[in-house]
Amino acid sequence: LQYFINTYNELNIIPMVHIDDNDSLHNMESFILSQSKKGRSIAARFPININNIDEYIKIITSTMTVNQKLFIILDSEQITESNIDEVIANLQLNMAKIKPILNENINAIIAGTSFPKTVADYGDKEGDIPIFEEYIYEKFQEPYVLYGDYASINIEQIEIKGGTFVPRIDVSLENIIFYK
């Protein structure tokens, strides 16, 4: 990673640390400190069900320089009709913990995807897929809270072996994606 960042420094690549409750704090601190010494912006990706986001962020911000930027990515992963209320509840808990520290140098990004693994649940040849991530973002939209999504893809990596690929056109509108 460091070689890549140094080689393409002019591209303003923002290194990201993925954090969950099982991570070693020492490894995270070492990575953040190494990037802070270089004055680079940092992104930290958290699952929305993390228990102590404020403790992790306190560690991160304690190593940051004055003008360094931090992007806190709250990753909702797959959002469906069956889990949207849980996603919103988890985001509310974590936003309440981080909202007091948000400013021009510390931004929150609410990310996720509602694009399904297969569109068959929405119709065989054509259909509409609700864009839940847009709906969720609108609930939390305010200064220093940014929108993020998975660019209309599903979070699962699917290996296609044999079979017939069926081309499809996806069109993203304000609240739905329709496909043909």
Question: What do these predicted regions represent?
Answer:
Residues 2-165:
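Eukaryote-skewed repeat-based solenoidal scaffolds used as protein-protein interaction platforms
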